[in-house]
Every structure is written in C-alpha cells, then in structure tokens.
C-alpha cells in the first residue's frame, strides 16, 4: 500500500476535500499494455487549471469521490485508480484540451461493455466542474479484447455463408417504414430480392405494432426469401428486427427466425442496450444466424463536437459486444460524415490491427487480435449515381443500402433493385479493369443505363 493511501495507527484519518491532482494527475506514469486508455476532450469551467480537471475526470470515472473517505485506507488506490497521464491543447480551441486517462484492467468485468461504459462514461459526464466532456477514443488492451466473443461470425464467414465474393453486398430498407400490412411488406421484400439485391431490411422503428405483428412479418418475409432464392439461384436475406421491449421477447423472436431457417436477424443496439445485444450476439453465433446492427439514437450521443462520445467509440464497443454489420454513415449521402474520419472508424470495424493516426481521428493503436471484423453499412440518402463513390470509398467489404434509392424508382421496386445491381456490377467491373471511379464514375453509370431500367 502506497504512502499516499496507507492508513497508519500513528497518523489517523484526516477528513476533508483535497485537490484531485494530488492523487490522480501523474504525468510521470508509463502506461501498461493491460491498461484501458481513454482520450477525453475536456471543456472546463473558467479558472480551473487543466491538471485539476483532467485529474477530476480520472478520479470520478474510477475510484474517486468528492471528499476523502476513511475506507480509502482499506485498499490500494495506487493499484485501482485511474490516472490522467498526459494533457494536450486542442488546436484552434483555447478553452479545450485532451486529457489522456489510463485505467487498470481490474476495474472492469470481463466481457462486459455495459460495465466498461458505466465507469468510463458514467456520472463523470454530469460533473458540474466541467462545462462539457467528450470521449474521443479508447484503447482496448489485448487482455480485455480476449474476454469478448465479438461478432457472431465476421466478414469471411458471412461471405462463405452467402457464397458472394469480390464486391460489396447490396441492401434496401423497406419503405414506408411504418404502416404496411405484413403481406404487402413481404411483397416488397420479394420484389427487391428478386430484382437482384442481397438483403432487405426492417426499418429500426419496426418491432411489433398493431398494423403488423412481428410473427406475421417474419412469416411473409421468410416466404419472400425462399421464393426469390428459388428464382435467382442466389442466397438472400432480410434483416428481421428482433428488438423488443424485453430481452425475453427479443430472444423469442430470434428463436423463431432460426426455426424459419432465415440467415440473419437485426438489433437496435443502442436503444436495446449492450447487455441485450451481447446476449443476442452469443445466441446468433451458437445458432448460425448473422446479426445486423442498427445505430438508432447514436446522434444523441455523438452529434455534438464537445460533449458525448465519438462514434468510433460506439463502433469499438459494438465490435466487442457483437454484430456482423453496423451502419457507419456514407460520406456522400444525406447524413453527416467526413471522409477521413469515417474511414478511420470503418477500418476500426474491419481490420485486425489499426495504427494511431490523428488525421483520421484515431488516438491509439488498436490490436483486435482474433476478434472477427464487422461489415460497415452505408445507407441513408444514397442512389445509383453515388455507386462509383461508394464502391471506391468503402471497397468490397461493405454493405451498400438503398431505401428510397431502390423503392423510389419510377417503374417500381424490382426495377429499382435491378438498377442498383447493374450499377454495382458496372462499377466493380470498371474498377477491376483499372478505371478510376472518381474520374469516370458518371460515364460508367451512363454506359450501364443501356442494360438497366
């Protein structure tokens, strides 16, 4: 037990408030391979030194509280406390700085994203000494990564299951998102899959509403899948949303999907919660189901530039909790997304080892060892004229998902699906022949129009 935290009979306990930096600011600390490292963007209240605020973040997200307590003497704070080990200014922002905090691995339950976030992004975000706080990135040590199952199957296993290689996968969200009967919904699924798409998708809002109960939807979608497979000779899927009001109902829906023999289910992992998501991911691996993840509610957490969490942290958490696909923005569609930053967290989803690269927003080198990769899904506000850019930006290991870009075709759902498939095949063929999609993309699509509705 260190001298700072040891309680000795001759000294006694001294109550009172003391500065956080006396205990939790340790610039001389050398980080360990087993530490979880965090980069926080801190906006302190005026007049508070950066060292004190960085130490406060470390304290309030680990062992500290607002005052000295006598039970500090019953454990070793030096072993368990978080440490602010480095502070750097944010270029162009006089009132902000980045505080780097190291957390001992023993603070966290094995295999629990829920517990990790409860500590690191818990009460500290309401700390009144801070005007704003944003978690920019985490370094997850190999020792902790190995306690997680991660994605149920991963990229290579999914391609083997689908027998589809050498191109991005194509998807479509069925619209209108709410209001269709189960039979009409299944009809739209069939038309899109028959037209050439690999997947169709429940919108994140679709659970089990009065106009379409989940069991009816599952049955009609399964019929559409099997009919389109028989007619095209390709393996097809529909993301059946298993998200429900309770974990028990969620699992009931996943079990029914498995009994129908469909290849994939879906979960809204932020609104459903990490505990539910990890439970579903384990079931999917054990039972051969792929798991599509929607990120509904993410903008509540990651939209603000100085408070909350960056999506790269949520992406890392999803890879640990488990999912084979996750929506990751588009760069070219109707949602926000800077190209380099987006590709940074896309690589964090797919690759085994990612080097630190601040130009892409990656604060730490991340080694995922044997954890399977996740396919990024580009969706929202995209159409066939975006196909060259999407193919170039996201590469083969991705899902390109067109909702209105399929169902909005003037000739109907099936021609819209055909148009997307023809555009994708044309872009992949042109790329493989050495053509520059960024330069020739428009010409490639115009040439493909000859063979497409």
Swiss-Prot record:
Q: Which residues bind Mg(2+)?
A: 201, 203-204
Record-listed N6,N6,N6-trimethyllysine modification sites: 14
Record note on modification: The disulfide bond which can form in the large chain dimeric partners within the hexadecamer appears to be associated with oxidative stress and protein turnover.
Q: Which GO terms describe its molecular function?
A: magnesium ion binding; monooxygenase activity; ribulose-bisphosphate carboxylase activity
- Positions contributing to substrate binding: 123, 173, 177, 295, 327, 379
Instruction: Briefly state the protein's biological role.
Output: RuBisCO catalyzes two reactions: the carboxylation of D-ribulose 1,5-bisphosphate, the primary event in carbon dioxide fixation, as well as the oxidative fragmentation of the pentose substrate in the photorespiration process. Both reactions occur simultaneously and in competition at the same active site.
Q: What is this protein called?
A: Ribulose bisphosphate carboxylase large chain
């Amino acid at each position: 037990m260190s001298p700072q935290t040891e309680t000795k009979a001759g000294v006694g306990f001294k109550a009172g408030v003391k500065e956080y930096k006396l205990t939790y600011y340790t610039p001389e600390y050398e980080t360990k391979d087993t530490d979880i490292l965090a980069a926080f963007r801190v906006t302190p209240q005026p007049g508070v030194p950066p060292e004190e605020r960085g130490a406060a973040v470390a304290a309030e997200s680990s062992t500290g509280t607002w005052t000295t307590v006598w039970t500090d003497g019953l454990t070793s704070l030096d072993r368990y406390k978080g440490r602010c080990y480095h502070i750097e200014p944010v270029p162009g922002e006089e009132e902000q700085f980045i505080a780097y905090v190291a957390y001992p691995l023993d603070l966290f339950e094995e295999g629990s994203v829920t517990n990790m976030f409860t500590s690191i992004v818990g009460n500290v975000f309401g700390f009144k000494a801070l005007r704003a706080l944003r978690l920019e990135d985490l370094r997850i040590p190999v020792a902790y990564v190995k306690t997680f199952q991660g994605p149920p199957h991963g990229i290579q296993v999914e391609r083997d299951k689908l027998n589809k290689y050498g191109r991005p996968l194509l998807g479509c969200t069925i619209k209108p998102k709410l209001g269709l009967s189960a039979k009409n919904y299944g009809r739209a699924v069939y038309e899109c899959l028959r037209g050439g798409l690999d997947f169709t998708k429940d919108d994140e809002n679709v659970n089990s509403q009065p106009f379409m109960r989940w069991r009816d939807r599952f049955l009609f979608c399964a019929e559409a899948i099997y009919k389109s497979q028989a007619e095209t000779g390709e393996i097809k899927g529909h993301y059946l949303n298993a998200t429900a009001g309770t974990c028990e109902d969620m699992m009931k829906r996943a079990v029914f999907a498995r009994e129908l023999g469909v290849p994939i289910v879906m979960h809204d992992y932020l609104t459903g919660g990490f505990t539910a998501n990890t439970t579903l991911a384990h079931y999917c691996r054990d039972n051969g189901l792929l798991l599509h993840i929607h990120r509904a509610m993410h903008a509540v957490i990651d939209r603000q530039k100085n408070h909350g969490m960056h999506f790269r942290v949520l992406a890392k958490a999803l890879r640990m909790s488990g999912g084979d696909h996750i929506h990751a923005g588009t760069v070219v569609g109707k949602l926000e997304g800077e190209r380099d930053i987006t590709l940074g967290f896309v690589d964090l989803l797919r690759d085994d080892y990612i080097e630190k690269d601040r130009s892409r927003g990656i604060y730490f080198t991340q080694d995922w060892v044997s954890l399977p990769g996740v396919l990024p899904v580009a969706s929202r506000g995209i159409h066939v004229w975006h196909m060259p850019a999407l193919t170039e930006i996201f590469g083969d290991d991705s899902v390109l998902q067109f909702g209105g870009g399929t169902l909005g075709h003037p000739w109907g759902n099936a021609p819209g699906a055909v148009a997307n498939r023809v555009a994708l095949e044309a872009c992949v063929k042109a790329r493989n022949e050495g053509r520059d999609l960024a330069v020739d993309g428009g010409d490639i699509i115009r040439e493909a129009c000859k063979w497409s509705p």
